[in-house]
C-alpha cells in the first residue's frame, strides 16, 4: 500500500443500507477507508493498520440473542471507535451499558440537544442560542444506560441517550446518521472524528489517486501489453484514460459496436479515444452478428444472455489476435468488491445484480488489472474529470450493459434499434437544452412493439409507440418519476413524431420504483 493508504479508517458493516454512504463521506473528507463485514476475521484488524474504527448501523436488535457484535479486538486495539446507530447500541451493550427496544421505531427528521461538549460536538449547533442539531434518525432500539466511563453528550425528547462518549478511550457513539445529508452537521462530525480524533491526513484526492494508480499499474504489468474492453461507459472510459497515461501504446482497447448503443456512440468513442487521446482502439462492427443472433428472441433474460455471451466471444476472438497481451484490464469498482465479499459472509444486504457484461471466459489466461477497484462511482467520475475526459461524458446517465436490447420490448430488430436510438437522442438533446439533464438521474426512451392508430395527412396510419422514462433517485434502489414540465414533454413528443417516420404516439412513464423497475426489461 502506498502513502496514500497509510492514514485509513476501517468501517465494520452491520448490514445498514447507509454503510457505503459512510465510506463515501469519509473519502470526500480526503481519507481512505474500507468496509469489512462485522464478522470478518478479527485477527486481520491489527494488520490492516487503521487509525480508527467505525461501527455502522444495521437492521438487527441488540436486545435479541445472537445479535451481531463488534470483535473484542476493536476495543483492545487502543484505536478511536465511533459507533453509529446500531454501532452505538452494540458499543453500549458490549461495554457494560444497556439497550432496550422501543415501543415504536423513530424514523426521519429529529432534533437532538447537546448536553455535554466533547471532541465531536463542541460548539456545534443548527439553532441560534441553543445547542441543538437537526439530524436523521432510523432506529427501533436505543441505549437506556451508558457504560461505565461514558458521558451522555446528546439527548432528544424521546430517547435518553442520543450520543455518548468516553474521551479517555476516544470511544464515541451517536444514535442518528451523520452520513445522511439531512443531518446538517454530519460531515463536520465525521471530519472531527477522522481528522481531529484519529489524526488522519487528507491525502485521498483525485490527483493523488491517479499518481498512485499509475505507479501501481506500471509496477504490476512492467513492459507487458494490456487489453481492455471499451464500452463507452464511464468506468471503462476512465480505465482507458488512466492506463493510457500509465503505459501509453502498450494498451489496446477493443470496442465492440453492437448496433445497440446510443445514437452515433461508436463514432463518438472513436473520436474521443482514438483521435483525440491517441489510444489504440480496435473497433469491431458487430451489429450484423447481434441482430442475427437476436432474431425471434423476445424473452428479456434470453436476450441478455445472448448479448453478453456474444460480447465475450467477440472479445475472445480479438484478444487471440493480440498474442503479446498478458493482462486484461477491467472497470471493477469498489461496490462490486463489497458485494462479492458481502455475499460470501451472507450477512450484508445483497444488492440486485446489474447488467454488467458477463464474466470473461476461464480459458483466457490473462492477469487482471483493476485500477478502479478501490473507488466508488462518484470518485471514478472525479478521476475522469481530472484525467481530462469531457464532463458531459463522465457525468452522463447510466446505460445498461445490453444497451438498447433491453429498451426494445420483445424481439430486437435493426429498424427498431435505429428508431429508438434516434428517439432517445432527441429526448436527451431536449433535456440538455432545457437544463433538465443533470436534474434527472436517468432518462431514456423505450420502444414498444405495438402499433397505434394515428392520422398522417388525411390518412389513418398504424405506427409504433415510444415511451419516455425519467427518474430522480439517490441510490437507484428506489426512484421517483421525474415531474418534467408538460410544455417540455410536448416539445419532445412533437420532435419525435415529426422527425421519425414510423412513430405516431409518445407516452410518458409515471411509475415509481418500487413497484416498477427503472428499466422496462
From Swiss-Prot:
InterPro entries: Class_I_gatase-like (IPR029062), GATASE (IPR017926), GMP_synth_C (IPR001674), GMP_synth_GATase (IPR004739), GMP_synthase (IPR022955), GMPS_ATP_PPase_dom (IPR025777), NAD/GMP_synthase (IPR022310), Rossmann-like_a/b/a_fold (IPR014729). ATP binds at residues 231-237. Catalyzes the synthesis of GMP from XMP. Transmembrane segments: none annotated. Residues 8-203 form the Glutamine amidotransferase type-1 domain. Signal peptide: none annotated. Pathway: Purine metabolism; GMP biosynthesis; GMP from XMP (L-Gln route): step 1/1. Pfam families: GATase, GMP_synt_C, NAD_synthase. Its EC number is 6.3.5.2. CDD domains: GATase1_GMP_Synthase, GMP_synthase_C. Keywords: ATP-binding, Glutamine amidotransferase, GMP biosynthesis, Ligase, Nucleotide-binding, Purine biosynthesis. Homodimer. HAMAP family: GMP_synthase. One of its GO terms (molecular function) is GMP synthase activity. This is GMP synthase [glutamine-hydrolyzing]. The active site is at 85 (nucleophile), 177, 179. The keyword ATP-binding applies. It catalyses: XMP + L-glutamine + ATP + H2O = GMP + L-glutamate + AMP + diphosphate + 2 H(+).
